[in-house]
């Protein structure tokens, strides 16, 4: 018997295409677009499953597994070496001045955010991935912080790439909260404004 290979219109329309657009603190007054980027953006969600051992067990058993840990991350390479991008790559770094006059120094050893500096964690990192039907998958990770190493290379006939590996974090006040959210939106993120209330005026 021949296997049916035809695709439905919905299957075609929901194919994700092209690179993603990434925003820091999307929908907040501090919203900004990341980049320019190279190589697109990659979201990953990982759960650590544990099988409950019991007498008579012969293999994996439905209802006898727990989730011990959840992780969510977004990876993206930025070509921008602005102070804002470097601060994102160096959580907890010490900054004096602003803009082109900013001076950035290493973070002090110790507990991050122990002094109440909220800038260590971004409110959110949001990626928009375009679908064939013109809509977008909007993927948001919460309380994002880069945990990758910063490398800056000056190479002839090449551009430096800042590799960001941003992980979502729970908060101490909500240890079972949301790490990420995936939804479908029709709005073109290129038309996004810093304060969403401005769109209503």
Name the predicted role of every residue range.
Residues 2-88, 143-161:
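Solvent-exposed edge beta-strands and adjacent loop segments
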Residues 22-24, 125-127, 182:
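Hydrophobic beta-strand residues in large extracellular and virion-surface proteins
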Residues 31, 135-138:
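Short, mixed charged/polar active-site loops
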Residues 64-66, 82-86, 115-122, 164-172, ...:
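Noncatalytic linker/hinge segments flanking ATPase motor cores
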Residues 73-77, 124-128, 163-167:
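Beta-strand secondary-structure signal
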Residues 79-81, 128-135, 171:
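Short, flexible beta-strand-to-coil junctions
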Residues 89-91, 95-132:
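Extended, positively charged loop/linker patches that create polyanion-binding surfaces
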Residues 137-201:
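Mixed-charge, glycine-accented linear interaction segment located at domain edges/termini
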């Amino acid at each position: 018997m021949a296997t049916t290979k035809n695709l439905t219109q919905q299957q075609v329309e929901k194919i994700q295409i092209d690179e993603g657009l990434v925003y820091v603190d999307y929908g907040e007054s501090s919203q900004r677009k990341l980049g320019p980027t190279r190589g697109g953006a990659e979201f990953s969600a990982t759960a650590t499953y544990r099988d409950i051992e019991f007498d008579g067990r012969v293999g994996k058993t439905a209802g006898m597994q727990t989730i011990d840990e959840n992780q969510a991350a977004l990876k993206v390479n930025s070509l921008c070496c602005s102070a804002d991008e470097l601060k994102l790559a160096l959580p907890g770094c010490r900054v004096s001045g602003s803009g082109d006059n900013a001076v950035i120094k290493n973070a002090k050893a110790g507990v991050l955010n122990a002094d109440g500096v909220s800038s260590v964690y971004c409110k959110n990192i949001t990626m928009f991935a375009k679908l064939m039907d013109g809509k977008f998958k909007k993927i948001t990770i919460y309380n994002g912080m880069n945990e990758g190493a910063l490398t800056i290379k000056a190479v002839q006939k090449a551009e430096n790439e800042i590799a960001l590996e941003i992980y979502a974090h729970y908060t101490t006040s909500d240890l079972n909260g949301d790490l990420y959210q995936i939804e479908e939106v029709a709005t073109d993120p290129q038309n996004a404004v810093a304060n969403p209330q401005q769109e209503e005026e």
